[in-house]
Amino acid sequence: MEQETQNQHVVPQVHLKSFLGKDKKKLSCLNINKLRIEKDQSPSRICSGRFHYAEIPGLSDEYGQEAEIAFGVIEDWYGKNKGKIEEKLINKERLTDGEKYDLSFLISNFLFRGYSHREDTLHFSKKMLDEITDGLDKDVTINGISQEDAYKEVEKTSYATNQAFRDGLANALTHKKWEVLINLNEKYKFITSDEPVIQYVPDFAKKWPMFSTSYVVMTQLFHLSPKVAIVATFQPNHEGEWDFIDVTNKVDKIFESNLKYINYSYKYAYADSDHFFQKLIDFESKKRNQDTQ
């Protein structure tokens, strides 16, 4: 095996660095659960873990190193093309089909290599195995595999990581309607987090409990940079359409998009400054005070 990469990033540094303020080397950081501003963080020291992509995180293995190399290829493309894509979108210019597919692959890759997807996959796999083995004697095998080995198998993270490379997920994104939010506001910019791409159930789909949480129906939100947000929505009658919306002077729209990151990220949010974070903390504090009166 070639030289190992021990510190493996879940969110690429090339993405985090684009959210740095001018002449700044660290990002403002919000602890989402505690709604507390933490000390500023360097992109090189966050959103990563020792042998994170190994099948058993923390332990070196060949799978984790191969995943790291594959992610590196994607990140190299991102670093080389991000500026051009951002400029096009700010100028309300549609991407070519090739550019849109490549960016869609990146978006789905970011989503399915994330903390939340891994946690959800591990939880679902264990829950499913619990249901299969419920009431079985310990010596009963499952397709010739002992129950002990079966539980060891579902603890592997590769089942979650592998989905980050599925072409079909990227292809599905290209067929959605893309709303591009353009934000040139110098004070309130788009934020990012330990989940560079988030997804959520759109309001219209909440009445479809069987389908609302499917990847196709859910809305994917990607803050490409402090200036550009991409909202990929399921709208069958508007498949593949583009809509460019300038939100520079619409602070409520900027806050709405940022709040989605607060609500659907893993643990931490990051930005070039703490303007939005402080505004959010003040709002929640005021709300609590009103509720107690």
Residue ranges of each PLM-predicted region?
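Alpha-helical structural context detector biased toward long hydrophobic helices
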Residues: M1-N7, V11-Q293
